[in-house]
Curated annotation (Swiss-Prot):
Residues 144-357, 374-469 are annotated as: Disordered. The gene is lsm14a. Keywords: Cytoplasm, Developmental protein, Phosphoprotein, Repressor, Ribonucleoprotein, Translation regulation. A motif (FFD box) lies at residues 362-378. RNA-binding component of messenger ribonucleoprotein complexes (mRNPs), storage particles that mask maternal mRNAs from the translational apparatus during oocyte maturation. Acts as a repressor of mRNA translation. Probably involved in the storage of translationally inactive mRNAs in the cytoplasm in order to prevent their degradation. Residues 148-163, 200-226 have a biased composition (Low complexity). This is Protein LSM14 homolog A. One of its GO terms (molecular function) is DEAD/H-box RNA helicase binding. Residues 411-421, 431-450 have a biased composition (Gly residues). Component of a ribonucleoprotein (RNP) complex, at least composed of lsm14a/rap55a, ybx2/frgy2, ddx6/Xp54 and eif4enif1/4E-T. Also forms a complex with prmt1 independently of ybx2/frgy2. Interacts with ddx6/Xp54 but does not appear to directly bind ybx2/frgy2. Different translationally-repressed mRNP complexes probably exist that contain either lsm14a/rap55a or lsm14b/rap55b depending on the developmental stage. InterPro entries: DFDF, FDF_dom, FFD_box, Lsm14-like_N, LSM_dom_sf, Sm, TFG_box. CDD domains: LSm14_N. Residues 287-323 form the DFDF domain. Belongs to the LSM14 family.
Amino acid sequence: MSGGTPYIGSKISLISKAEIRYEGILYTIDTENSTVALAKVRSFGTEDRPTDRPIPPRDEVFEYIIFRGSDIKDLTVCEPPKPQCSLPQDPAIVQSSLGSSSASSFQSVSSYGPFGRMPTYSQFSTSPLVGQQFGAVGSSLTSFGAETTSSTSLPPSSTVGSSFTQEARTLKTQLSQGRSTSPLDSLRKSPTIEQAVQTASASHAPSAAPVGRRSPVLSRPLPSSSQKTGESSEQRKGELHKTQRPDTEQLRNDNRHDPNKRQPASSAPQPRRGRGGNRGGRGRFGVRRDGPMKFEKDFDFESANAQFNKEEIDREFHNKLKLKDDKPEKPVNGEDKTDSGVDTQNSEGNAEEDDVLAGGVCYYDKTKSFFDNISCDDNRDRRQTWSEERRINAETFGLPLRSNRGRGGFRGRGGGMGFRGGRGRGERRGPPGGGGFGSSRGYRGGSRGGRGGREFAEYEYRKDNKVAA
């Protein structure tokens, strides 16, 4: 496109939608990205045009500025391209360069076509904007400096235009990938400027060129990409910091942070350590590798039943039903078995049935009593203690729901914390004038004992009834 454009090298006056006028030399027009590149650009400000943000003119001369075509309001040609300085068509000439005297004035496209390389990252140490915006580009960018330290070739204008278009595309691609910082609020920005490299004068060396102003149009989508870049840089710093930990943590995290110690994917995996290894071990036990069980023939029930001896099973069952203690029987339910002849007759009449059921021991006789003798405790040698009765009641009826009172009552009934309180009634039955600390502790024990007594009052009532009976 640039080879067939007759305006390449012309002096262009451009007015942006922000009413700011720029003058520079048309370098290239990119139809794909809709951008226009000007060299040796100077900003004349708004020049009394109606705008909400008037901007004064500036004396700085920018090496080049790339404008977005959609933000250009007006574009006029001030001067046609100047004639090229003619060199003799001598095949012996391979390379040539112009002196610094011709750098101030624009001679031809070929005079500024051979660009010098952009200064390296270390030369842009004055501004953080340059460090991230132009430092990452490095030597891939080209500047419009006329003073070149090394001799360069003189390509035709079409070749120069196409090369600058590629550089502009590369610059926009790198900017879209987040190689720019957040917008600087201290600088006035124009919405049409995409990139600007500022210089004090045209004859100044390109290595000392600072960075000019940038456009807020590009700065709008940049914070998200720059934020991603900041996060990735923080992750890289974190990985670098983790690799410099002490040896103990390196041995524990070497597979995670140190890429030099990672095994190739084709090699056999090493045994895992820590909790991950335990999880892996549990996972291996749950896998059945032998497949489902296969049966060759049906189950033979007849041979399995022949292995059982029914007589031995019946004998073992009857032995379990017999009582272990063969002590002489005591009066059951307040009656003696040998008291009346009716009892003897009933026992003789039911002898065969009792022998069949439990080996001659009678556990229930409806003529004597309504209750059976299986769970009777009257034939014991001694009375059961309070703790045994409490345990039996708990097994029979369950534990009370009011656990707090039960726990306090147990402490009170056993004396609890009341040393002088006796059976939990230290305040009433303790020694009079026991004084201060002892009486207070006795009172505490007594209070808890009182609650506990109310909790198990029903159990004591049953026991008293049994004794009375």
